[in-house]
Curated annotation (Swiss-Prot):
Protein's UniProt name: Isocitrate dehydrogenase kinase/phosphatase 2
A GO cellular component annotation in the UniProt record: cytoplasm
Annotated organism of origin: Pseudoalteromonas translucida (strain TAC 125)
Catalysed reactions listed for this entry: L-seryl-[isocitrate dehydrogenase] + ATP = O-phospho-L-seryl-[isocitrate dehydrogenase] + ADP + H(+)
Pfam families hit by this protein: AceK_kinase, AceK_regulatory
Annotated S-S bridges: none
Subcellular location: Cytoplasm
């Protein structure tokens, strides 16, 4: 095969992937208009599998047309030509990642360096797609603030009427005056830059933009919801970067948003959320493979500019995962152990399936996103002998040492958080009460979207920077509707009552909510905190009703912003 033919074949595979991805994404607005929430979830899951399908197709074609042995000179020329094709491509960075995926499926990891793949983004010095391609500007000085906001709303054809748009705009303007700095209060002192298409997720659409004035740039997010079958309404205005970071958080499902130039969209969002990494923003808008590429580049850059050693991650060691971390880098590396603890009656394949289940599910801000990698290379010098020994003992079949490098065959990477049990050890009563209340709320929100976490011990939950409680241990995750919730059998005789343990049969899917406090909250103070805020969690009927709601087709909406900011309180 000629270099040009190979380069064109890979680029054609990428084009097919991107067109299908955008075609799938474009179904979200109609599903939102029809209030077809199941379709929204189906679209979200389908997009996640698109990428690997197209990579597999392209790889299979190349295998049919060339030998398995790498022709180094040929592939050096292929990469050079491919790079030329991308100079003015609007999705160049995604096309580079697609190339990497195809090459890495074809050849051995010894070729995974910048000569043959795009370890570095080679187009960083090329002319960038202008950010202006992704937004439209509005000038209140021309028509006034209220008419301008009405123009913005009407620009988006939601294919459904508003219940009372005049009321919503009045509440929106009132909220804007309350939240915006004084310098924004005059129409001639500002400009609105609004992204062309809404962001869809779950049961909401979000209009995203920024307010530009002499005092700086401020996020501008409007949440749009359905009022049952009566029509649309504006639900909230958010104008703080910190609020925006929560909405775009790592524990939420990916947004569905149409874009011709993802790099321009990400740069726009990064200006509004400078504390978010490029990788996190690509993930947030659904390009999780690009997020994976950008994250690995961030990791390599961090390794170059740091010298600390890897250590065992803080927290109680698990029976399924070996977890280590680099203290100066805010993530943990999770590797499936060779052997599980006796209380884990399942194997590696089950763990892989459960992590994939969470990846494709609505995480409602309560389940950390994971990045899955194969054949990750670590500098051996950054591991001390004690840690290496522990790795050999627990994940020996998943690691290889080659010269100065440690290669992990398969791992997951998650955001590092403070384990809830460790947080509580050092928390005062007020902080502990808040954390336990958040823990209970996290359980309720996962339950509402048909997720049963399985192991609900405090050690399996983390405390984020925003003091949110996030679940991160997925080896026992199952659908709520697959579980059998039971009340504890009552003692039949006085002798039964005196026994420390009741004698009754328990099936694998059986769950006894009454035992939640017994096993999860042994500290009586924590139990008191939980019972004062979420007493229904130990009521078997609460769990059964949650199951029935899901079976009846009810789809819950978890608000990613404080309910106090909802306009509905001022109707």
């Amino acid at each position: 095969m000629q270099p040009r033919h190979i380069a064109e074949l890979i680029l054609t595979g990428f084009k097919k992937h991107y067109l299908l991805f955008q075609k799938t994404t474009a179904k979200a607005p109609l599903a939102f208009a029809k209030r077809d929430w199941q379709a929204i979830n189906d679209i979200s899951r389908l997009r996640i599998s698109h990428y690997d399908d197209r990579v597999n197709e392209t790889t299979a074609t190349l295998r049919q047309q060339q030998t398995e042995q790498l022709d180094e000179q040929l592939w050096l020329e292929v990469k050079k030509l491919y790079q030329h094709f991308l100079c003015f491509h609007p999705q160049a960075e995604l096309a580079e990642t697609f190339y990497n995926s195809v090459f890495c499926r074809l050849y051995h990891r010894r070729y995974f360096h910048n000569d043959f793949i795009f370890v570095e983004a080679t187009l960083k010095d090329a002319p960038a797609v202008p950010v202006e391609a992704e937004y439209r500007s509005y000038f209140p000085v021309v028509d006034g603030l209220k008419p301008t906001i009405k123009q913005i709303i009407n620009h988006f054809d939601f294919k459904a009427p508003f219940v009372n748009l005049e009321r919503d705009i009045r509440l929106l303007v009132k909220a804007f005056y309350k939240q915006a700095p004084d310098t924004h209060h005059k129409a001639w002192q500002m400009r609105f830059d609004i992204l062309h298409t809404p962001f869809y997720r779950n049961k909401a659409a979000y209009i995203v933009g920024r307010v530009v004035s002499q005092s700086g740039v401020q996020p501008f997010i409007i949440a749009v919801l359905h009022h049952e079958d009566k029509g649309l309404y504006l639900d909230a205005l958010l104008t703080k970067s910190s609020q925006m970071r929560v909405i775009f958080g790592f524990a939420r499902a990916y947004f569905m948003v149409e874009t011709h130039a993802p790099c321009a969209l990400v740069r726009f969002l990064n200006q509004l959320m400078p504390n978010k990494t490029i990788a996190e923003l690509y993930n947030a808008i659904g390009f999780h493979k690009q997020g994976k590429t950008e994250f690995y580049r961030e990791f390599l850059n961090h390794l170059t500019h740091s010298n600390d050693e890897f250590t065992i991650a803080p927290g109680t060691p698990g029976m399924v995962m070996m977890v280590f971390t680099l203290p100066s880098f805010g993530y943990v590396f999770k590797v499936i152990k060779d052997k599980f603890g006796e209380s884990k009656p399942f194997g590696r394949d089950t763990v892989l399936k459960r992590y994939q289940l969470v990846k494709k599910h609505d995480r409602v801000g309560r389940m950390a996103d994971t990045i899955e990698y194969s054949n990750v290379v670590f500098p051996l010098a950054r591991f001390d002998s004690n840690l290496l020994q522990q790795l050999h003992q627990t994940i020996g079949s998943s690691m290889v040492i080659e010269g100065d490098w440690l290669i992990i065959k398969h791992l997951y990477i998650e955001r590092r958080m403070t384990p809830l049990n460790l947080f509580l050890e050092n928390a005062d009563d007020a902080s502990a009460a808040d954390a336990i209340e958040e823990y209970g709320q996290a359980l309720k929100e996962m339950i509402a979207v048909n997720i049963f976490p399985g192991d609900m011990l405090l050690k399996n939950f983390g405390v984020s920077k925003h003091k949110r409680i996030i679940f991160y241990d997925y080896d026992e995750v199952q659908y709520l509707t697959d579980m059998n919730f039971r009340a504890l059998p009552k003692a039949k005789t006085y002798d039964d009552y005196l026994m420390d343990e009741q004698s009754y049969s328990v099936a694998p899917q059986d769950v006894f909510p009454e035992q939640l406090c017994t096993f999860v909250m042994p500290n009586p103070i924590y139990k008191q905190f939980l019972m004062s805020t979420h007493p229904e969690l130990i009521d078997v009927n609460f769990w059964k009703q949650a199951q029935q709601n899901i079976k009846n087709g009810q789809v819950s909406h978890i608000y990613p912003y404080p309910t106090a900011q909802r306009f509905i309180h001022h109707w």
